[in-house]
Amino acid sequence: MVSLSSVGITSALNQMRTDIKTSTQTSSNGYEIQWMLEYGNDPRTDARYEGPQPIGDSDNDGKNELLISGRDCTIRVMKWNENQQTYQQVRALRPPFYPFIHCSAGGMAIGDVTNDGKNEVAATWYTTVYRYIAFKYWIIGLNPYIFKNNGGSADCLIGDCDNDGKNELILSGGPGWESNSSVAEITVFRWNGLFLKKVSEWKDPDVNGYVYMAGLGDVDEDGENEIVCAYENKVIVLNWDAQNKVFVPTQIYKTYGQVSPFGVVCKDCDNDGNAEILLSYDGPRITIFKWNGTGYPMQFDITWPGGDPVIEGIDVGDADNDGANEVCAGAGVTHILQWNESTYVEEATLPTFGWMAVVCIGDCDNDGKNEINAGNVDVNIDSGELFTEWVFKYVPET
């Protein structure tokens, strides 16, 4: 175990920011702002970053926490305080060797990396894993392979990508600014009981691509998970070949005239029990692909004229707690769409703004109902916009 622990942030830091604890605005159809925090207007430190799995039980106490990241060398662990009816920062995770090393977590995730039935927190910086032990988050493992080889790691997620019943830590990224880097678009690590070991990768033989965010799920309905990633204007489904220990790629789409997709989500958005593939673009645009038995035709495609880039601000989940999943996508304002058996129709919008790098659905306040976490990575500073993180809650009319 590396003897580096989390660093507490005092209340003085929170006093330097605007923390709105209760609902002050209502968007369409019953969604209220449960909480928001305005970080400031400095893009070097205040911009918010995405993590595909930021809501979960990170300290194994039976209650969920919310992770918030950004360009400030910090992952904030937020916990709902029922008495004060607000989210409070209970811990702050720093990169290894901080303050001698300054870097930001482009992605973070909560899940069982070590396959012992307890959750850890994973972060992209140095491919680091934290475990909550004795009232602190301790670094139990890291693997600097990506950084050592002049690569970048934009995001990470935890799940079983080789279908052996055990989780891996999946890093998306690539060569970064170093075109001669050996770092792959997808790099997979596994906890071997002592440390994180690099066990597999997907390196495109034709291009040096960069994957901002990958998705994981059973998108071809064969009972096994696939990784979906997008780079260099193409979308790839990666099937693990267990016999040859390699990923087998299938290109499902070419994004002509579009910047490569930023966000990728593999979840059931039409409520038929099977995962679809959702992509978000600079556009601002999202597309949805659905397996038909032989391929992945496009099920849905929408662009919001005049909207801001969606970036990684896309997720699927039961946002209004009606038993059916919705699609949430941030294109300046955040759009909430639901399948009506023929297409996706807009149910509501949320009053967000800027380039949305964060849109995640989960139970943040531990009441058994989902909330929507949102945050922006770029704003119009000249017009007075601030980098902001929100939590929205659906409150049905009585």
Label each region the model flagged.
Residues M1-S27, V264:
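Secretory targeting signatures
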Residues I33-R44, Q88-P99, G141-K148, K197-D204, ...:
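A short beta-strand motif characteristic of beta-propeller blades
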Residues Y39-R71:
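Beta-strand-rich domains and repeat architectures in extracellular enzymes and scaffolds
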Residues E50-S58, A105-V113, A154-C161, Y212-V219, ...:
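Beta-propeller blade termini
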Residues N60-S69, N115-T124, N163-S172, E221-C229, ...:
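Acidic/hydrophobic-patterned starts of short beta strands in beta-sheet-rich repeat architectures
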Residues D72-T74, Y126-Y130, G174-N180, K234-V235, ...:
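Short glycine/acidic-enriched loop and turn motifs that connect beta-strands
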Residues R76, T128-Y130, T187, I236, ...:
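WD40 beta-propeller blade core
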Residues A357-T398:
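Blade-level signature of beta-propeller repeat domains, shared across WD40, Kelch, NHL, RCC1
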